[in-house]
């Protein structure tokens, strides 16, 4: 139908970007005056980026994980996460000194953060994950299609 065609046409023509914009009171087209840097490649379709210690992290479908300097946009490392080549709808999260990324097919990649990030391990929850994990009270909460997992130290009584 026409609505479906419009959706797919718009998706094909989408011009997704990751960019840094200077804050201020400007109005109108700020491209020439307030955009510090811009990338049109390696841009995620759904997940939000994660900013941690001056490094902006993004994950793209196919398990492509990118670390760039937030101040300049310089890409420090962009590579596929072996064992976690998946579609990503949830956003990366930082907890317990690590980065966690949940893929649609249930793979959870655990990474050492930094400009030259390192894939530490991949865990398979064996069912879809669409939600971004949450961290609270020393635990990581991961929601799969049928279960909410609480991972971490047992609470003191």
What residues fall within each predicted segment?
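Noncatalytic, solvent-exposed loop/strand surfaces
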Residues: 1-157
């Amino acid at each position: 139908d026409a609505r479906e065609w419009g959706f797919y046409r718009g998706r094909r023509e989408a011009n997704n970007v990751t960019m840094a914009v200077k804050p201020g009171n400007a109005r109108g087209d700020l491209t020439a005056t307030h955009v510090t840097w811009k990338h049109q490649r390696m841009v995620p379709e759904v997940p939000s980026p994660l900013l941690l210690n001056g490094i902006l992290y993004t994950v793209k479908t196919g398990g492509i994980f990118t670390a760039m300097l937030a101040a300049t946009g310089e890409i420090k490392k962009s590579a596929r996460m072996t064992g976690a080549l998946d579609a990503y709808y949830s956003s990366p999260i930082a907890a317990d000194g690590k980065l966690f990324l949940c893929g649609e097919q249930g793979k959870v990649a655990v990474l050492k953060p930094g400009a030259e990030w390192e894939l530490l391990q991949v865990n398979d929850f064996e069912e879809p994950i669409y939600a971004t994990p949450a961290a609270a009270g020393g635990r990581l909460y991961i929601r799969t299609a049928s279960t909410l997992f609480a991972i971490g130290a047992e609470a003191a009584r």
